[in-house]
Each structure stands twice: as C-alpha cells, then as structure tokens.
Swiss-Prot record:
Main location as per UniProt: membrane
Annotated ranges, domain EF-hand: 41-76
Cellular-component GO terms for this entry: actin cortical patch; cytoplasm; endosome membrane; plasma membrane
UniProt keyword annotations, A-Z: Actin-binding, Calcium, Cell membrane, Coiled coil, Cytoplasm, Cytoskeleton, Endocytosis, Endosome, Membrane, Metal-binding, Repeat
InterPro entries from the UniProt entry: EF-hand-dom_pair (IPR011992), EF_Hand_1_Ca_BS (IPR018247), EF_hand_dom (IPR002048), EH_dom (IPR000261), End3 (IPR025604)
Domain EH, chain residue ranges per copy: 9-99, 138-226
Protein name: Actin cytoskeleton-regulatory complex protein end-3
Subcellular localization: Cell membrane; Endosome membrane; Cytoplasm, Cytoskeleton, Actin patch
Length: 396
C-alpha cells in the first residue's frame, strides 16, 4: 500500500496554515518562510520544495500544496529522500491538481504517450488538402457518435471508440497520431471539441486524406478546456488511453461512422434538416464558418470591382458606385465585429449573438448578388446604346 498523509498530519498542517493566513486561502512566500526555515534545510533545498509543491505555479501555496511541501520536508528530515525529489510521487499529488501535473509532464516529455509516428508522405493514394471546416451533416454525425460514447463528465476515452476504429479503413498508427494531435496534454479522456475534431480527422483519413501535422491555435485552446472533477472520493480512473491493437482491418468499409452507428441501433437516425449555422454552436467552429463566408464575400467583391473597372471607359453609373461603397463600409463593419468576437470585446463581451452576425453576412451576400445583377443589366443597356450609336453613324 502506498504511503499517505494521515488525518492527524492534515490537522496539524491546517493549524499551522490557518494561523499563518488568518483564515485566508493562500500562503505567500513571506508568510511561509518562517515555518519552512525552521526545518533547518538549506535555502536552495527550500526553493526546490516550494517549486515542487506549487503545482499551479501561481506563486502561492493553497492548503493542499502546503501539505505537500510539509510532507516533503518531513520525509527529507526522516531520511526518506537523500535530496529534494525532481517530481512529486503519484500518491502525494493532490487529486484536484492531477491534471496540471500530467500536463506539465506531457510538456517536459515525462508523461506516457502514444508513440509518435513519422509522417508517411510517400504513402500511396493519400491526398493533401485537409480542411478543418465541418459541414452540418458531418458535424451532426460526429455529435451522434460523441453522445453515444461520452462519460458522465462529458468526455470520451480512446478505448471507448474501439468499435468505430474497427469499422474504418484507417491504420492504427494514423488513429493514434490523430489522438495525439487533439490531446496535447496526454490525458486519458478528451472533451467534446477535441472529440469532434478527432472524428473529423478520422473521417478525412478514411476518405484518403493525410493526417494534418498541426492544429489551429484557437482549436488547440478549446481542447485544453477540460472539465475538472473536484470530488476527492471518486476512484481514480486509468490516466492513459490503452494502446489499440496493431492490426486494424483495412478492407473496404462503409462511409465514415455509418456502419458503427448502425451497430448502435441508430441507423434510422436522421437530422432535422436544420443548418448548423442557425443553431448555437461552439465559438471556435463559428469563427471558422464566418471566416469562410467572409472569404467568399471578398471574392465576389473582387469580381464586382473588376467588372466596374472594365466599364470605366463608358458613362459611369453613380447608383451602383454608391451601393458598392455602402457595402464596403458594411463589410468593414462586419470584419470589425468578427475581430471583436475573436478578442472577446464589444458585443461579444456583452453576450452578442453569433447567429445575428451570420444573418447579417447572409444579407450582405444577397446585396452583393443584387449588385452584380444590376451591373449586368446596366452593361446590357450600355451595349444597346453603343449599337444604336453605330447604327446612327452608318445611317448618315
């Protein structure tokens, strides 16, 4: 049985902690110095004990971290350690901060993780062109798979999707690479955003596209927003995803997820036909969609400007020019709104609706199309006038 901090110890530490903090929740370095120096350890050792116990690196010790520091000091004095350990033993890690320790170990290369697989750029038949954008139909399917496999905390483990892996024509090495990509902290489970991205990568790989090498920064940040359980009585689960079998069936498979959902009894599942742009979705995916729409509008505006430049030799129509300027101003305003949305300012900070932004963009798109139609009609009128002038010249 691993050692543990006894209840009597905790009570002793609490009396010291509460006396030093005057009922506060944190102990500063100045408040802790007299207690720690009474141990007789060297200053450099005490500095390392502090760094080891300050798991969240906020420069203070809460009560759990103070217990860790005191226990390490007592173990040093009792000869359990020859020197300050470089890492905390697992039994001494506060469960409420275990995720921070695991993330730190992942960043320093000390955590278990799937073997990194070299990119196989010469794999026959694989295509470039992976796109992070999820169509409404694909996202609906991903969410269905997520709902069938999430645990009570809304997270999904690697092993929970084993039946799905078996239904795909994707090698296990690529499956593990995709998991590593969306799980930078090497956790045993991933949240909803990471799960949807993981399924999206597998879908593209199933369709013959290469696994991407990096994840957009905005998505990577959403992967790390995992929900933490603070119930210390919960039994600890396995911290690492189990390595899948190295031999995955690679024969001809059904379309991504269909065979798997059929086995789950969901073959009759149909979407309501509602576009996801009208539903409340996660901010990161909404940003991708809005940026795509902005790019399409930019392309259309460029075509309109090009058409206007071609007809500058004739009589200038002031009405289309006025409409064009107004649309450009509206487009600049929408771009500013998108920047505010990304930075959490303005309407976004006050709870502004992403749906209203998407609706406004749709309105701009309709107006641009109307402007193009108007330009075409004016060009037809211009051509007619030119023909009449030529006919008049010939008649003379």
């Amino acid at each position: 049985m691993p050692p543990k901090i006894e209840a009597q110890e905790i009570e002793t530490y609490w009396n010291i902690f509460s006396a030093r903090t005057n009922g506060g929740k944190f102990l500063t370095g100045e408040q802790a110095a007299p207690v720690l120096k009474n141990s007789g350890l060297r200053d450099d050792q005490l500095e390392r004990v502090w760094d080891l116990a300050d798991v969240d690196n906020d420069g203070n010790l809460d009560f759990e971290e103070f217990c860790v520091a005191m226990r390490v000091i007592f173990d040093l004095l009792n000869g359990e350690y020859a020197d300050v350990p470089t890492t905390l033993p697992d039994w001494l890690v506060p469960e409420s901060k275990a995720h921070l320790v695991q993330a730190n170990r992942a960043l320093t290369g000390k955590a278990p993780k799937f073997e990194q697989v070299e990119d196989e750029d010469d794999t026959p038949g694989l295509k470039d062109g992976f796109d992070w954008y999820m169509s409404p139909a694909d996202k609906s399917k991903y969410e269905q798979i997520y709902q069938e496999n999430r645990d009570m905390r809304g997270e999904v483990s690697f092993a929970a999707l084993q039946d799905l892996y078996d239904s795909l024509s994707v090698p296990d090495t690529d499956i593990r690479s995709a998991w590593n990509l969306v799980n930078p902290s090497a956790s045993s489970t991933i949240n909803k955003d990471a799960c949807l991205a993981f399924l999206h990568i597998l879908n593209y790989r199933h369709e013959g596209f290469r696994i991407p090498r990096t994840v957009p920064a905005s998505l990577r940040a959403s992967f790390e927003r995992n929900k933490i359980t603070y119930n210390v009585n919960d039994p600890s689960q396995s911290r690492w995803a189990q390595k899948a079998d190295d031999e995955t069936s690679t024969g001809r498979k059904a379309k991504f997820g269909d065979q798997y959902l059929t086995r789950l009894g969901r073959s009759s599942f149909k979407t309501a036909g509602t576009d996801f742009s009208s539903e409340q979705t996660d901010d990161q995916w909404e940003e991708v969609r809005l940026k795509k729409q902005l790019a399409e509008l930019d392309e259309k505006m460029a075509k309109v400007e090009e058409a206007a430049n071609r007809r500058r030799g004739g009589k200038r129509d002031t009405k289309p020019a006025l409409v064009k300027r107004e649309l450009e101003q509206l487009l600049d305003y929408k771009r500013k709104e998108l920047r505010d949305l990304e930075e959490g300012k303005g309407k976004a900070a006050a709870g502004g609706s992403l749906k209203s932004v998407a609706d406004d963009l749709a309105t701009v798109k309709e107006q641009v199309e109307g402007l193009e139609a108007h330009l075409r009609s004016r060009q037809d009128v211009l051509e007619q006038l030119k023909r009449e002038i030529e006919e008049e010249k010939v008649g003379r």
